[in-house]
């Protein structure tokens, strides 16, 4: 059995380590908290813990997604709720964008071979629980990339030919 003084010293050392650990963990937790509007780069807008940026320089879907990946955890935007869709619609309309379509991260890598539109997914691998098609995509159209359409107020999705050059929205960590 250890002497009482050794147990007391070890108890204080353990307590000191635990206190230091809680301070360090608290600092990490603060960094992971949802971002404030000021932490997004100029020209982008915050929503939740992400920054969103509309780029008016047109690119095809693949090049647009690659451009978005240059940002922290960035991809073409995934639209995961009606509230996020409304935020995006407002952002795009207030930008003065004059195009009919804007690229989002939706695509069908199966090229329509998966039945019942089952091949559609987000480029960042987010789960597709929210569905908001303007018109159901056709497996035979050759259009396998997703856009937001002006006709729907930039609220609903429409399939388009992936090589079209369009403006695009990136979603990335603040």
From Swiss-Prot:
CDD domains, sorted: CLECT_REG-1_like
Compartments reported by the entry: Secreted; Cytoplasm
Residue numbers covered by motif EPN: 114-116
Keywords annotated in UniProt: Acute phase, Antimicrobial, Cytoplasm, Disulfide bond, Inflammatory response, Lectin, Metal-binding, Secreted, Signal, Zinc
Propeptide positions: 27-37
Induction (free text): Up-regulated in Paneth cells by intestinal microbiota (at protein level). MyD88-mediated signals are essential for its induction in intestinal epithelial cells. Induction in the lung is dependent on IL6ST-induced STAT3 signaling. IL17A and IL33 induces its expression in primary keratinocytes and skin wounds. IL22 induces its expression in lung epithelial cells. Feeding with a fermentable fiber-enriched inulin diet increases expression in intestine. Expressed by nociceptors in response to LPS.
Tissue: Predominantly expressed in the small intestine, including Paneth cells (at protein level). Hardly detectable in the colon (at protein level). Highly expressed in the lung epithelium during methicillin-resistant S.aureus infection and allergic airway inflammation (at protein level). Skin injury increases its epidermal expression. Also expressed in the pancreas. Expressed by nocireceptors.
Domain C-type lectin: 47-171
Record-level Gene Ontology MF annotations: hormone activity; metal ion binding; oligosaccharide binding; peptidoglycan binding
Record-level GO BP terms: acute-phase response; antimicrobial humoral immune response mediated by antimicrobial peptide; defense response to Gram-negative bacterium; defense response to Gram-positive bacterium; MyD88-dependent toll-like receptor signaling pathway; negative regulation of inflammatory response; negative regulation of inflammatory response to wounding; negative regulation of keratinocyte differentiation
Pfam families referenced in this protein's UniProt entry, alphabetically: Lectin_C
Covalent S-S links between cysteines: 40-51, 68-170, 145-162
Domain remark in the UniProt entry: The EPN motif is essential for recognition of the peptidoglycan carbohydrate backbone and for efficient bacterial killing with Glu-114 playing a key role in peptidoglycan binding and bactericidal activity.
Protein name: Regenerating islet-derived protein 3-gamma
Organism: Mus musculus
Upper taxonomic lineage: Eukaryota, Metazoa, Chordata, Craniata, Vertebrata
């Amino acid at each position: 059995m250890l002497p009482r003084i050794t147990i007391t010293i070890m108890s204080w050392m353990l307590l000191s380590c635990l206190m230091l650990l809680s301070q360090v963990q608290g600092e990490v937790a603060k960094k992971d908290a949802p971002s404030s509007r000021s932490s997004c780069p100029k020209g982008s807008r915050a929503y939740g813990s992400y920054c969103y940026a509309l780029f008016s320089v047109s690119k095809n879907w693949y090049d647009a997604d690659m451009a978005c990946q240059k940002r922290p955890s960035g991809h073409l935007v995934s639209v995961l709720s009606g509230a996020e869709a409304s935020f995006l619609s407002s952002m795009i309309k207030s930008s003065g964008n004059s195009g009919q379509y804007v690229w989002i991260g939706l695509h069908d890598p199966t090229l329509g071979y998966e039945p019942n539109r089952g091949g559609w997914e987000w480029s960042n691998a987010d789960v597709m629980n929210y569905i908001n098609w303007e018109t159901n995509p056709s497996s035979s159209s050759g259009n396998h990339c997703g856009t937001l359409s002006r006709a729907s107020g930039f609220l609903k999705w429409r399939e388009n030919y992936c090589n079209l050059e369009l403006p695009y929205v990136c979603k990335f960590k603040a």
